[in-house]
């Protein structure tokens, strides 16, 4: 990893995300028949990057519910590597550190004063999703983060613009996104980040 070479801290996140069922009762994090899949994905992540010094935090996944399958995944991960803290967005009861996604600046300022009784250390597990002309308040986040010793930063979503070049009939190059190829349905310009 270039992160090892240049000293960039990395949070490695298991490939578990299920927006469709998210945090409701239908979340795949609850049924017993999905437990092995949750544990396997978390352990595959850990085995792949355990020897990379840049990986300082493990993440059980993203936006996939609060169920017992994540407890099993956490237990397996800690048995394999107890040296790194584990986080899972919003589901702070089963992990080592607190997290939240896209908190408002007001929420951040309240958290700094102990208003919400959150688990520490704490980090913003997803923020700075630079859609269009966004992230003008990034300095406000960092003023809150740096105002205390229990906030430990945040994870930028996404680190890359996911659009791709396409060409007009006259050869003019432009950044294309959903719908530019006649594809339906699509997510429009959701990939135009940063």
Regions flagged by a language model, labelled:
Residues 1-191:
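Substrate-binding/catalytic cleft of secreted carbohydrate-active enzymes
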